[in-house]
Amino acid sequence: MASEAMELNGGVNRRDDPGARPQQGRMSRNTPLNMNHYANKKSAAESMLDIALLMANASQLKTVLELGPSFSFYIPLITLISISLTLQIIVGILLIFIVKWNLNDSSKHYILNLLENIVTALVFIVVVVNVFITAFGVQRPDDKTS
């Protein structure tokens, strides 16, 4: 098992001194990947994308509300945008929990895996809902005065 861990971390069959420690550096191939750091960066990137989509949906909601009930797809768009915003807030909260828990604690692996799967499913639903929002269209009619 120890040799397997050494092999995974790049310490087996090295040409230099067998007792030498792996180089410590940001881009070194010999340093093991810090999974907690990687997961935190991944979750932060997902959160930034979630914030961008949240802002886009808020803008779409504002436009639909300005168009008023006379707009042909008023109720469906209000419903879809509200669903999308709610799901995005839930995803954001779940991502905060995922980032806060220590990935190296094996007792938390099951719950972290479950949360990751839930977040993935919710993000898929958000994407599908936003496809329908785009299909219905949220553009203001052109004000042509002639």
From Swiss-Prot:
In residue numbers, the region (Helix alpha1) covers 41-52
**Is Transmembrane helix given among the entry's keywords?**
yes
Q: Which residues lie on this side of the membrane: Cytoplasmic?
A: 101-110
Q: What is reported when this gene is inactivated?
A: Morpholino knockdown of the protein results in impaired heart and skeletal muscle development.
- Residue ranges, annotated region (Disordered): 1-33
Q: Does the keyword Plastid apply?
A: no
Q: Where are the annotated segments for Helix alpha2?
A: 55-71
Q: Which is a Gene Ontology cellular component entry for this protein?
A: synaptic membrane
The UniProt keyword set, sorted, is: Angiogenesis, Cell adhesion, Cell membrane, Cytolysis, Glycoprotein, Inflammatory response, Membrane, Synapse, Transmembrane, Transmembrane helix
Q: Where are the transmembrane segments?
A: 76-100, 111-135
Q: Which family would the database say this protein is a member of?
A: Belongs to the ninjurin family.
- Description of how the protein assembles with itself and partners: Homooligomer; in response to death stimuli, homooligomerizes into long, highly branched filaments and large, ring-shaped structures in the membrane.
Name of the protein: Ninjurin-1
Name the source organism.
Danio rerio
Q: Taxonomic lineage of this organism?
A: Eukaryota, Metazoa, Chordata, Craniata, Vertebrata
